[in-house]
Amino acid sequence: MPRRGTIERRIPPPDPRYNSVLVQQFINKVMQRGKKSIAEKIVYQAFDLAAQRLKKPALEIFETAVRNAGPVIEVKPRRVGGATYQVPVEVKSDRRQSLAMRWLLMSARARSGKPMYERLAAELIDAYNNTGATIKRKEDVQRMAEANRAFSHYGRF
């Protein structure tokens, strides 16, 4: 075991528009090559478009989409006696949010033909309604964990 203490996680300051740490983390994930102002513009335009289409507050749409897209259980490889088993483990809330935001962004980037803010808005709306590529990814991860339930006893030590 390492002798040094655990590192305290740095939480970014909340974003100026919605005063939400979660939105700021999402902006940081959208950001490429340090261009934060462009990332903010994309996220805010996507939020405005989603709010306009669903006629609900943008922050509520985003938080519900992240909640819907986050997996409850996932598999982690564990090596036991020369064999590697996929052991189902519960996902902690921080990782659940992080995975959900990452998957939302990946699914939005995988869509084609429209500006990024429109693709992101469409993916947020789909996740809000429990449909789309992000939700399919979550269900695949959870199905994999369910299929490997027999190995869950390896995760308890």
UniProtKB/Swiss-Prot annotation:
GO annotations of cellular component type: small ribosomal subunit
Family (UniProt): Belongs to the universal ribosomal protein uS7 family.
Annotated organism of origin: Roseiflexus sp. (strain RS-1)
UniProt keyword list: Ribonucleoprotein, Ribosomal protein, RNA-binding, rRNA-binding, tRNA-binding
Function: One of the primary rRNA binding proteins, it binds directly to 16S rRNA where it nucleates assembly of the head domain of the 30S subunit. Is located at the subunit interface close to the decoding center, probably blocks exit of the E-site tRNA.
HAMAP family in the record: Ribosomal_uS7_B
SUPFAM superfamilies the UniProt entry points to: Ribosomal protein S7
Gene Ontology terms, MF aspect: rRNA binding; structural constituent of ribosome; tRNA binding
Family annotation (InterPro entries): Ribosomal_uS7, Ribosomal_uS7_bac/org-type, Ribosomal_uS7_CS, Ribosomal_uS7_dom, Ribosomal_uS7_dom_sf
Name the record gives this protein: Small ribosomal subunit protein uS7
Top-rank taxon, per record: Bacteria
Keyword Ribosomal protein tagged: yes
Subunit organization: Part of the 30S ribosomal subunit. Contacts proteins S9 and S11.
One GO-annotated biological process of the protein: translation
